[in-house]
Amino acid sequence: MKDLIIIGAGQAGLAMGYYLKQEGYNFLLLEAGNRIGDSWRNRYDSLRLFTPREYSNLPGMIVKGEGNGFPCKDEMATYLEEYARHFTLSVQLQTEVFKIKKEKDIFELHTPTEILQAKKVVIATGGFQQPYIPSFSQHLSSHVFQIHSSQYKSPSQIPEGKVLVVGGGNSGMQIAVELAKTHGVTMSISHPLTFLPLRLFRKSIFSWLEKLGLLYAELNTKRGKWFQKRKDPMFGFEGKELIRSGAIKLEGKVVHASENSIMFQNGGTYSAESIIWSTGFIQNYKWIEIEKAVNEKGFPNHVKGISPVRGLYYIGLPWQSQRGSALICGVGKDAAYLLSEIKKIDQ
């Protein structure tokens, strides 16, 4: 039996592992993927982070390369793999936990091949789990090509002609920008877009956000509450310029679909040929069969990652304790805090 098991060996799980390693804990990381970093490795081919390398680090190890440059997805996948190797973090791959229970003071983690036991558990599966596509998409004709943004790889994957990108987040914008070179692109958005430069006065925008106290704004502060009410901005002006030139057309929120017709909230319609649903992800915590671990809405029940269930913790959730909780640059702060809380119950 382990002192502690971390479910998920992505950026959040590895950051937690780093701090536990420093304190000599007997712990194990469980990773469902074939390799550490697959969540990055399997993203679309052209993906680059909008956080520069100097803001793309986990505790104790920097990303190789020029600090102001923007790492690609494969760099990040390699970095995470090398991070686990460098700190000799114990990771068990190809191990999906499909159920977790607590019997007396011991957690039981059910996998397809075994039941693992631990005194404490950190759930680091993150806030982005199952791709979400609106149910009305099922009413579209089979002739309409449809994929979720998590399945998108490159423009060659999309049939010739026009394409509708549904969703106004940074992933949707990056995909729309790439497709605008080869396809007629329309974006469906549900709110006005705000654009921020990647650099301002030769400094990364993230440097300015940090100086303004916004990058790591804490959950219940005035800055944090203000930030939570705002939609995430688009980073970079390439999309803005393509919208201005007409290379990317904008439409409102999609509310219904039938055959090859898409209906927007303003009453307009669109004849669909190909659709990329950049509509985000939903969290699924039904596999946690522990009373009080999950609230009535199905979300983790916690305060700054600490569950009311003794010995159970969460890490990597959006706004877990601060703005950077789900970002690679900020997850280490939460990991350090959780370590201090874990040590308290061991005293």
Residue ranges and their predicted role:
Residues 1-33, 38-39, 68-170, 174-347:
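Flavin (primarily FAD) cofactor-binding/catalytic cores of flavoenzymes
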Residues 49-68, 216-219:
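Glycine-rich flavin
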Residues 35, 44-47:
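Aromatic-lined carbohydrate-binding/catalytic grooves of carbohydrate-active enzymes
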Residues 40-44, 51, 62, 199:
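Short, flexible helix/strand-to-coil boundary loops that buttress conserved ligand/catalytic motifs
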